Each structure stands twice: as structure tokens, then as C-alpha cells.
Amino acid sequence: MSNILQSVPVNQKVGIAFSGGLDTSAALHWMRQKGAIPYAYTANLGQPDETDYNAIPEKAKAYGAELARLIDCREQLVAEGIAALQSGAFHISTAGVTYFNTTPLGRAVTGTMLVAAMKEDNVDIWGDGSTFKGNDIERFYRYGLLMNPALRIYKPWLDDAFINELGGRKEMSEFLIKSGFDYKMSTEKAYSTDSNILGATHEAKDLEELSSGMQIVEPIMGVAFWRDDVEVKRETVTVRFEEGRPIALNGVVYTDLVELMLEANRIGGRHGLGMSDQIENRIIEAKSRGIYEAPGLALLFIAYERLITGIHNEDTIEQYRESGRRLGRLLYQGRWFDPQAIMLREAAQRWVARAITGEVTIELRRGNDYSILNTVSANLTYAPERLSMEKVEDAPFSPADRIGQLTMRNLDITDTRHKLAIYSSAGLLTGNSSVALPSFEKDKK
């Protein structure tokens, strides 16, 4: 049996994730006119482009909401962002520049906290502004049903009646004006933006064309570092971690992680740090393109990964990165709270993050251009004296030790040479290869 309603649930409470924008304003008022009883829930995610959160619930009431609530999600969102950082839950990157899954993290928090608030008000029908082509419709569906198994979904954008009457921005604006609201449609940008305290996503419209570069975007969390008229000064910043948690920036200790993230955003934003241009695979396997900002997470991630490479061994780092990519995909798919994701996340937090204590000093320049100036930690296993080219007292190993180690390598070298001779006899090492390979012969018995 489907949980999705395809027409307005008349005389029933309908919770709507209300942003105060044109889409949700028109949808809320239209639902009220059609006989639904809308309840509006607004998530305070620390969006950098939102100036007055308290005005949003009042706006919802004016459009016909029976009840309008503002839910502060910032603390939970930052906590989930730090958990993603600790576990390296980022699977999308281009040439080493990372997308920090900031929108999927926002959806995980919004989807769970708003539905929890709806349950308090005995609201078991939920709607939001996600379209059928995107990722969010599935993310919200999963998180909503995880929080409330009795939840039913009503999305105006899946209702033919709504689409036929108010299928575009022009129609929605005219509808509100005819209903007596002094609504002025904002100038439409060349792309759409979605943001929270962790980062911003710019996509769609002109950005769907790969010939439109990052230069058409006006950053909301940082500076347009690619412009010659934008001055960006070098800046040195020190980031301190304690058992995997960021606790200090430039010597200032933060007990409130929200305040720490805001300051990290300000520091990274002054340089345009963390901006990236990514082509990605949506949940439905169609490709999309986005321009992303995440100045604070990018700053923290540089320091965190520097400490990881200085503290952990190769096998641990490999496991952390492989598990992180897998976890990043689960997060992207709306499975952040699924058992397989919790298993990967908690393993990284316990066995990787717990050892990460120390300070990293970084020089920031333009965009993602930076240098690491110093790394300090009592947990470092980096010990230059072990490999020093100078003569040292009590060397950890001698030339004779290395001779013995190399002699042991003869075992697998012999096996490898034997296999290559088999492949050579079969003609597998000649022909199509553009590289001249040596001729191999089997060892004579």
C-alpha cells in the first residue's frame, strides 16, 4: 500500500516544510483553499542567506497555517557534520577537490527533526517542496518514515490539480496576488541555491550547461576568489582537535560547536576555500552538476586529514578512506541513519577519530590554494629520526637488517616472475601494449 497521497487530504492536518519562499507560500495557501488544514514547520539550519527566521512562521500563518513552528536544527546539523568529517563520509570529488555532502546532511536533520515535531502535534501527513526528478524526494521519504511509520506523504508537486493550476513561478505569484497578498516575485537568478550552516549548493537553470562556469555564481559563504578585483590576503590559521573533535581556532576554545562552525566559515570564506564544481550521479543514476561551498568544513577537513596521515598507519588510513566513500554514498542516498551507515560511522569515530588530538597550522590563499605550515600532536607516529639520512645514535634498524628484509622479498619476486612468464607465453604481455615490456622466461628447475 502506497504512503503517497495524490490529491489534497481534505479536513486533515497536513504538515509542510515551510521556507517562506514562493513555492511553499503558494502551496500552503492553495492547500488551505482546497480544504486541508496546513501546519507549517520551518527548520532553522543556519542558512547564511536567511536574515529573519522569526518572521517565517508569521508569514505562514498569514497564508493560512493553522499552526506555524520554528525548529532550531543548527546544533544537530553541526553534530552530524562533524560525524561526517570524522568518518570521511565524502564520496564525490574532482581532482582531489571534495564535495562535503552538505545538502544530504541537511536533509537528514530536517527530515527527522521536522517529522518529530509533527508527531508532537499529531500531524501524520507531510509535504515539502522536493520535485520528482531530484534526490530530496527520496531522502525526505526515507527519513520521514523512519521517524513515523504511520506517516503519509502529500506533495503538491505530485498532484496534477496543483500542477495544472500553479505549475510555474508566474502562476504562483499571480495566485497570491489575486488572493490579496502583496507578493512581489524576486528577480529570478540564473541558478537555484540551497544552503545551511555547513555549506551551499548552487545548481539548475544556467548551471545545467557545462559551458557555464563557476564564474556565474555569486558566493553566499565566501568570496568570488576568481575575480581580479576581489582582494584576498594570505592568512595563517591554527586548528586544534581533541579526540577527533574540533575545539579551537587560532587558540580560541569553543564549547559551542555551532559558534566554532560559524567562525570556521568566516575564516575559510574570506578565501573562497571549499568551493568546487562537481558532476555527480543522483540516486536515480542520472547525472547532475552543482557548484558547492563549504568553507568551514573544508578548513577543518584539511587539519583533520593532516593529523590522520601523521597518526595512523597505512592500513587504517586505507580502511578509513574506503569506508568513508561507502558511507558518503549512503549519506547521499538518504541512508545516514541506516544500520550499515551507523556501523561504518561509529567504527571510524571510535578507531580513527579518537586518536586525533593535535594542532595544524595552515596558510590560506585564494580558493583551495593553501599550505600546511606545522603539525603538532603527542600521538604522531611520524618520527623523522627513523629514516634520517644522517648518522644517528641507536638507529632503529641497520644495513644488515635491511639486507635480511630484502632477501625475504625473493620469495614473492620469484612467484611474480613465474606468473609473468606464464602470461608472456600466452601472448598477454605483447601486442596491444604501448609500453615495451621485458621478456620473461620461467625459472629453470
Curated annotation (Swiss-Prot):
- Note the Gene3D superfamilies from the entry: 1.10.287.400, Argininosuccinate synthetase, chain A, domain 2, HUPs
Localization, per the record, is: Cytoplasm
The record's EC number reads 6.3.4.5
User: Main subcellular localization, coarse class?
Assistant: cytoplasm
Enzymatic reactions? L-citrulline + L-aspartate + ATP = 2-(N(omega)-L-arginino)succinate + AMP + diphosphate + H(+)
Kindly list the biological process annotations in GO that this record carries: argininosuccinate metabolic process; L-arginine biosynthetic process; urea cycle
An example GO CC term for this entry is: cytoplasm
What CDD domains is this protein classified in? ASS
Q: What class of enzyme is it?
A: ligase
Q: Where does L-citrulline bind?
A: Y99, N135, R139, S192, T201, E203, E280
Q: Which UniProt keywords apply?
A: Amino-acid biosynthesis, Arginine biosynthesis, ATP-binding, Cytoplasm, Ligase, Nucleotide-binding
What SUPFAM superfamilies does the database record attribute to this sequence? Adenine nucleotide alpha hydrolases-like, Argininosuccinate synthetase, C-terminal domain
Which residues bind L-aspartate per the record? T131, N135, D136
Q: Quote the InterPro entries the UniProt record gives.
A: Arg_succ_synth_type2_subfam, Arginosuc_syn_C, Arginosuc_syn_N, Arginosuc_synth, Arginosuc_synth_CS, Arginosuc_synth_type_1_subfam, AS_cat/multimer_dom_body, AS_multimer_C_tail
Named in its record, the pathway it takes part in is: Amino-acid biosynthesis; L-arginine biosynthesis; L-arginine from L-ornithine and carbamoyl phosphate: step 2/3
Q: Which GO terms describe its molecular function?
A: argininosuccinate synthase activity; ATP binding; protein homodimerization activity
Residues binding ATP are A17, F18, S19, G20, G21, L22, D23, T24, S25, A43, G129, T131, D136, D194
What assembly does the database describe for this protein?
Homotetramer.
User: Per the similarity annotation, which family is this?
Assistant: Belongs to the argininosuccinate synthase family. Type 2 subfamily.
Under which name does UniProt file this protein? Argininosuccinate synthase
Cite the source lineage: Bacteria, Pseudomonadati, Pseudomonadota, Betaproteobacteria, Burkholderiales
